[in-house]
A protein has these predicted regions:
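Helix-to-loop junctions at the C-terminal end of transmembrane segments
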Residues: 72-86, 172
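Multi-pass alpha-helical transporter architecture, strongest
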Residues: 182-201
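A membrane-interface helix-boundary motif in multi-pass transporters
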Residues: 170-188
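Juxtamembrane intracellular "pre-TM" segments in multi-pass secondary transporters
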Residues: 1-26
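Intracellular juxtamembrane helix-capping segments at the cytosolic ends
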Residues: 127-141
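Helix-loop junctions at membrane interfaces in 12-TM secondary transporters
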Residues: 105-117
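Structural signature of the two symmetry-related core transmembrane helices
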Residues: 88-103
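Short amphipathic helix-loop junctions that connect adjacent transmembrane helices
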Residues: 41-58
Length: 201
């Protein structure tokens, strides 16, 4: 079963390599989603190390804010994409993520500031996740086996998460966790540059 799964993913990758638009989009998604997933995984560690006086209930409130505002964010970015196109919607989301990393690095030291950051994460998280998948779905070939293509999409997400988390940890080891957050900007910038090379609306 495992071997069959790998063979299926290999065939999907072979097909994707022959499709310029999909290949470029996957590269862009890999970069910006690597940073997005790393933020979600490492947010609690950052709060515990860097936020003065933060308590468990503060983290719970932050998680609730992210979940609630994520719904709103998906609606807002869906409207943006409908009016201006998916690429612009994704570009706006990535730019907000870049701004968020800079905001956290320079200004987030207290619980109420962390709440603001969590609210921003929620809004842009819901938007970028829904737009990323819908954009990918529009690029897929006419086939009944879309599940294999989305399996490949999900695998790239998991690989990106692993690389992002390792990179975050290495940077923290040699500097500090706040610098690790700032370094995520590199992934977002790479993601938006690659996205602008994708010939889609």
């Amino acid at each position: 079963v495992v071997k069959a799964g790998f063979n299926e993913l290999r065939l999907v990758w072979k097909d994707i390599k022959s499709r310029l638009v999909v290949r470029r989009y996957i590269a862009s998604y890999f970069m910006f989603n690597m940073a997005v997933q790393t933020v979600m995984i490492m947010a609690t560690a950052f709060a515990n190390k860097e936020i003065v006086g933060i308590k468990t209930q503060d983290l719970i409130v932050s998680i609730l804010l992210i979940q609630f505002l994520g719904i709103l964010g998906s609606v807002v970015f869906s409207k943006i994409a409908t009016r201006f196109g998916n690429r612009l919607g994704l570009s706006i989301a990535i730019l907000i993520w870049i701004g968020l990393c800079l905001f956290v690095y320079f200004f987030v030291f207290l619980p109420w500031q962390f709440y603001i950051a969590a609210s921003m994460v929620g809004l842009v998280m819901g938007g970028i996740q829904s737009l990323a998948r819908s954009t990918y779905s529009k690029m897929l070939p006419e086939t009944e086996d879309h599940a294999s293509y989305f399996s490949f999409f999900d695998v790239s997400e998991k690989i990106g998460l692993a690389i992002g988390t390792i990179s975050f940890g290495l940077i923290e080891t040699f500097t500090d966790i706040r610098t690790s957050v700032l370094a995520l900007v590199v992934f977002f910038v790479a993601g938006i540059i690659l996205l602008l090379r994708v010939p889609i609306k």
